[in-house]
């Protein structure tokens, strides 16, 4: 469906609203700066980034009499990019505002390249990635493998969660079972659920995954990430979209990465849907490392410059012939490498 064109009045109104928001934000930031200059800010303390709105972030106080309260904070210009899940040092101001003065060291960082090749952080300090797939939209090995390569390169464990099990039928059952079996054979944890069948209550299998963990849900649009989160956090207002009947693709429903505290313990980060998880910022060697069954074969090819594309003496081809690498995973590996080559041919470089 083509995008609806806006008339001049609509464009003017949108620009006016954006300008007003910018002015309000600048006014608040100036007020906080004046408080800092006057010595009116509170003492430095630890906080947690629970939401990100451009230059403003929601920080939850982690200590002191205001522990658990949320403050809208501004970021000092000398601080690198912050993401949901970051732990920071901040100073409270008036009217639930504050200033972030430092970012604490990260345990890990999940990031991906944007359409221009620049790395964009997604979430920090997470215990595992929950990769949600579903019978509809149809799951594809290549997209799943992109997420798994990203998790392996970040040293963040990944769990594959099959949602919408109520949509499994005789037409797709064998394909889905074969797909899940491939990843279980590689040692990946696989869980199953159906948010539509839990009547709004959290499924025990999902609660077990997220309990006392900091989790981030990823997956293509339409697989039901927001629906699952809504069962875990029924009091939170999350917009839930349906799969488009015309395209079969999902509709993005989450626009801002947010961190939620779970009633049963643990935290959950819900980030905007990601349709394509590009890996062109990686080297071929890093992609090799991201495939668990290929990792032990690194450096075993006959020639050091082996491209793993049918070259003589390729250790990957030998492993595939021996059944140690599935045809689907090898095809996915080749496609990722080809995508990287295509991006380089287009002149895409990291900034």
Curated annotation (Swiss-Prot):
SUPFAM superfamilies: Nucleic acid-binding proteins, P-loop containing nucleoside triphosphate hydrolases. GO terms for cellular component: cytoplasm. Its main location: cytoplasm. InterPro entries: G_CP_dom (IPR030378), NA-bd_OB-fold (IPR012340), P-loop_NTPase (IPR027417), Ribosome_biogen_GTPase_RsgA (IPR004881), RsgA_GTPase_dom (IPR010914). It comes from the Bacteria. Zn(2+) binds at residues 301, 306, 308, 314. It is found in: Cytoplasm. Residues 107-277 form the CP-type G domain. One of its GO terms (biological process) is ribosomal small subunit biogenesis. GTP binds at residues 163-166, 219-227. Its cofactor is Zn(2+). GO terms for molecular function: GTP binding; GTPase activity; metal ion binding; rRNA binding. Binds 1 zinc ion per subunit. It holds the Pfam family RsgA_GTPase. Its EC number is 3.6.1.-. Keywords: Cytoplasm, GTP-binding, Hydrolase, Metal-binding, Nucleotide-binding, Ribosome biogenesis, RNA-binding, rRNA-binding, Zinc. NCBIfam families: PRK12288.1, ribosome small subunit-dependent GTPase A. One of several proteins that assist in the late maturation steps of the functional core of the 30S ribosomal subunit. Helps release RbfA from mature subunits. May play a role in the assembly of ribosomal proteins into the subunit. Circularly permuted GTPase that catalyzes slow GTP hydrolysis, GTPase activity is stimulated by the 30S ribosomal subunit. Monomer. Associates with 30S ribosomal subunit, binds 16S rRNA. Belongs to the TRAFAC class YlqF/YawG GTPase family. RsgA subfamily. This is Small ribosomal subunit biogenesis GTPase RsgA. It comes from Marinobacter nauticus (strain ATCC 700491 / DSM 11845 / VT8). The lineage of its organism: Bacteria, Pseudomonadati, Pseudomonadota, Gammaproteobacteria, Pseudomonadales. The gene is rsgA.
């Amino acid at each position: 469906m083509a995008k609806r064109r806006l008339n001049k009045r609509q464009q003017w109104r949108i620009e006016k609203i954006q300008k007003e928001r910018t002015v309000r934000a600048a006014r608040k930031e100036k007020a906080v700066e004046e408080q800092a200059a006057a010595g009116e800010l509170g003492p430095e303390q630890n906080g947690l980034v629970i939401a990100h709105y451009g230059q403003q972030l929601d920080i939850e106080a982690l200590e002191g009499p205001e522990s658990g309260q949320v403050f809208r904070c501004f970021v000092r210009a000398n601080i690198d990019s912050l993401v949901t899940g970051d732990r920071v040092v901040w100073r409270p101001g008036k009217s639930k505002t504050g200033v972030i003065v430092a970012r604490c060291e990260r345990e890990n960082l999940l990031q991906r390249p944007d359409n221009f090749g620049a790395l964009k952080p997604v979430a920090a300090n997470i215990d595992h990635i929950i990769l949600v797939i579903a019978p509809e939209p149809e799951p594809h090995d290549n997209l799943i493998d992109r997420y798994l390569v990203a998790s392996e390169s970040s040293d963040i464990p990944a769990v594959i969660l099959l949602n919408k099990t109520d949509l499994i039928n005789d037409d797709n059952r064998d394909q889905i079972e074969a797909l899940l079996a491939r990843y279980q054979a590689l040692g990946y944890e696989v869980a199953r659920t159906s948010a539509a069948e839990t009547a709004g209550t959290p499924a025990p299998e999902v609660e077990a995954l997220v309990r006392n963990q900091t989790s981030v849900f990823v997956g293509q649009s339409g697989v039901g990430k927001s629906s699952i989160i809504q069962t875990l956090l029924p009091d939170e207002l999350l917009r839930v979209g349906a799969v488009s009947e015309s395209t079969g693709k999902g509709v993005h429903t989450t626009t801002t990465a947010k961190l939620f505290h779970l009633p049963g313990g643990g935290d959950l980060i819900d980030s905007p849907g990601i349709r394509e998880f590009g890996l062109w910022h990686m080297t071929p060697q890093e992609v090799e490392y991201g495939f668990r069954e290929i990792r032990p074969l690194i450096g075993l090819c006959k020639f050091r410059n082996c491209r793993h594309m049918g070259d003589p003496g390729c250790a990957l081809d030998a492993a595939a012939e021996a059944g140690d690498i599935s045809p689907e995973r090898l095809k996915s590996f080749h496609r990722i490498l080809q995508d990287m080559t295509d991006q380089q041919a287009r002149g895409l470089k990291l900034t």
